[in-house]
């Protein structure tokens, strides 16, 4: 399982962007791919990229900043299944419903 986030986070928000990618990977026990823009927009906001691939443990195995580039990463299904088997948080889920 993998989550893909395409974003537009400017340079002053680099830290929250990276931390949110890590948090999403951990809480969902999934790989997370975060793709953020680079360069300058029409209002003068600077974007540093900081695109990343994060594993379910929260380790960023690829991170790029400041320039347009192509990232390559390999996601390992067996490693994901093994991690989930050893740390089965999904077993704590409760059935619930939303009444609108």
How would you describe each model-predicted region?
Residues 42, 60-61, 80-82, 90:
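A broad, structure-centric signal for solvent-exposed, well-ordered loop/edge residues
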Residues 1-71:
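CN hydrolase (nitrilase-like) catalytic-core segments centered on the catalytic cysteine
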Residues 69-86:
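A short, polar/charged loop-to-alpha-helix boundary motif
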Residues 81-100:
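Cysteine/selenocysteine-centered motifs that mediate thiol-based redox chemistry or coordinate metal-sulfur cofactors
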